[in-house]
Amino acid sequence: LRSENKNRRGGKTKTTKHGKSNRRSKKRNRRNKKKISRVAKTGRRRSKSINSIKENKTMEKQNRKQQKKPISLTEKELFIFDVEGVIVPSIDEPAVPQDVLETIEEIRKKGKKVAFLSNISRTPFFRVAEILMDLGVAKSQKEIFTAGKVAVEYVKSKSQKKIPRVFVISERGLLIDFEIENGVEVVFEKPVDFVVIGMKRNLNFEELNFALECLLEGAELVSCGHTNYYKGKFGSKEGIFIGDLPICEMLSFASGKPYVKIGKPDPVIFGFILTEFEINPNYAVMIGDKIETDIYGAKNLGITSILVQGIETKKHFVPVRTEKEIKPDLEIKSLKDILAFI
């Protein structure tokens, strides 16, 4: 009783040294438990992250194996070749390497069909056909497809009239394609059924305003090619010129009317070739040197795509940009490398 009274002052009990040490040990135990819990959680997190890393590495290895797995082209029936950059440096510089000629000939010997595709509209179709046949690349005009030629066929197929009236904003190449074709009439006065846009370095507002009036009165809008802008020369001026797509975008915005694109990578030009050859996309191959047009367009239709490090030429044209990551089914350094897969 005396010791209890001595340890009480003002109704409070003093804590003995032994009591303090007990509380301290309890606190230490609690802290240790928390540390152990944190370490355990961290360990679980680390083990999960390690497992995740291992899984990712395994998937990457599997993907690499799949990519490295060689594809077979033996069942393919139609081989479509880009012209500028794969067959010739440029249609304006028509020289074809010997190994390119030999490769195409070997593909023919294996019983395959071949086609040659270009977004060209600055040069008329008949001239492109002449060049490719004179070089020994193409056997006939039926194997050759240009944006200009397909644009003419598209207008004829979509018109509700026997002979559609067409207003063309372009340089001579595309204009000639429409002028010499039976079944269409090139006009410079109303009424107009189709407004077709190509590339024109001396474009003026009078043409644009007339095109807009025609669209507002019911004409359809068609873009021939697939170019934002390009480098070129006109008279004494050398530099950048506006392409067909921005002109169509402007007229489409002003008139509120959509437009059809004729040219890689859009499906109309690929679909036209497949229809002409009566080939299913699964049995066709596209060989090109540009991801944004050749490869992207082929993959959209289920056509096997091959990227070739061809003849570096495209000095005059800037490809249309795309934010999507596009990978070809096969990459080769030289066109002759394709023979190993057929």
Place the predicted regions along the sequence by residue.
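Asp-based, Mg2+/Mn2+-dependent phosphohydrolase catalytic module
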Residues: 63-94, 100-101, 105-110, 121-126, ...
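Conserved phosphate-coupling serine/threonine residues in phosphotransfer and NTP-handling enzymes
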Residues: 118
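Arg/Lys-rich, intrinsically disordered low-complexity tails that mediate electrostatic binding
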Residues: 1-58, 63
